[in-house]
Regions:
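ANL superfamily adenylate-forming
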Residues: 2-37, 145-147
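Conserved pre-ATP/AMP-binding loop-to-beta segment of ANL
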Residues: 26-45, 52, 75-81
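Conserved S/T- and glycine-rich ATP-binding loop of Class I adenylate-forming
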Residues: 40, 46-49, 82, 88, ...
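Conserved AMP-binding A3 loop
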Residues: 41-65
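Conserved AMP-binding/adenylation subdomain of ANL enzymes
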Residues: 64-81, 89-130, 140, 144-148
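Gly/Ser/Thr-rich phosphate-binding loop
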Residues: 128-133, 142-207, 220, 227-230
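AMP-binding/adenylate-forming core of the ANL superfamily
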Residues: 222, 233-243
C-alpha cells in the first residue's frame, strides 16, 4: 500500500500467512539510480502475437505513460482497493493491478493463487472496490456467487466496477455480474508490447458489448494494409499502434 510520504504499508488478509522478515538496511541511505525515460524497465515474455515466446522490452516512459492513462480512464483514487489476483509478471496485472494502483496511491489486495472461494473471501475481507481479472476468473466467480447468493451482499455497494481483458467476456457473464453484484465489467484491448493497454470501454461513454472501447490518452491507432498504407474507415487491415 503506497502512501504519500513515499513509504509502503503492508496489510495481510490471510491469517495463516508467515510473518515478514525484518529488513535491517531499511534506514541505510541509497544513492538514487540515474534512469532515462527511454531506458529499458522490464522485458515481458509473451507468445500472444507470434505463438513463440519473445521478449517485449518496455521503457520507463512506456510503463509510466500507460499507468497514468489507466488512472485517468478508470478514475482510480487513493481510496480504492484494487484486486491483485492477476500474476504481476503479466502485463495486465503489472500495469493495471500494480503500476496504475501505485500511481493513484491506491491499495492492492494481493492473492497468491487464484481460486474462486479464496478470491471472493479476499474481495470481502479487503473491501475491494475495483476488480481486474481475465474472463475465466469472472466466469468462475459468477458461478460461485450464483451458488452462494448470500455472499453477493458484500460486493454490492463496495465493488465499483470490473476491468476485463485477455479475451472476450461472454454477454451472459456481463449480465450475471450486473444482476448478482450490481457491477459493470468494462472490456478492453492490449498486448504486452504496448505496456499493455491500447483501448478500453469507459464509464464516461458506457459499456458497449462486443467492443474494446476507445483508445487511451497518449495512444494512436491506425488500420493499414500490408504495405503500410492507411485504410479508409470501415475497411479491414493491420492494426498499427504507437504511443
Amino acid at each position: 500500500v503506497p502512501v504519500k510520504n513515499g513509504s509502503v504499508r503492508c496489510e495481510i488478509f490471510e491469517p495463516s500467512a508467515s510473518p515478514l522478515a525484518p529488513f535491517d538496511g531499511v534506514d541505510v541511505p541509497l544513492a538514487p539510480a540515474v534512469v532515462k525515460e527511454q531506458d529499458p524497465a522490464v522485458i515481458l515474455y509473451t507468445s500472444g502475437t507470434t505463438g513463440r515466446p519473445k521478449g517485449a522490452t518496455l521503457s520507463h516512459a512506456n510503463i509510466l505513460s500507460n499507468a497514468r492513462s489507466c488512472v485517468k480512464v478508470f478514475g482510480f483514487t487513493a481510496e480504492d482497493v484494487i484486486f491483485g489476483g492477476l500474476p504481476l509478471f503479466h502485463a495486465f496485472g503489472q500495469t493495471v493491478s500494480m503500476n496504475a494502483a501505485f500511481a493513484a496511491c491506491a491499495t492492492v489486495a494481493l492473492l497468491p493463487r487464484f481460486t474462486p472461494d479464496h478470491a471472493l473471501s479476499l474481495i470481502e475481507a479487503a473491501r475491494v472496490s475495483v476488480l481486474a481479472a481475465v474472463p475465466s476468473m469472472y466466469i468462475s466467480l459468477a458461478a460461485l456467487m450464483a451458488e452462494q447468493p448470500e455472499r453477493c451482499a458484500h460486493l454490492r455497494g463496495t465493488v465499483r466496477f470490473g476491468i476485463s481483458g485477455g479475451s472476450a467476456l461472454p454477454a451472459p457473464v456481463h449480465e450475471a455480474w450486473k444482476e448478482l453484484a450490481d457491477c459493470t465489467v468494462y472490456e478492453g484491448y492490449g498486448l504486452s508490447e504496448t505496456s499493455p493497454v491500447v483501448s478500453f470501454n469507459q464509464a464516461a461513454f458506457g459499456m458497449v458489448l462486443g467492443s474494446v472501447g476507445r483508445v487511451l490518452p497518449g495512444v494512436q491507432v491506425q488500420v493499414r494494409d500490408s504495405a503500410g498504407v492507411e485504410r479508409p474507415t470501415g475497411e479491414s487491415g493491420q492494426l498499427w499502434v504507437r504511443g
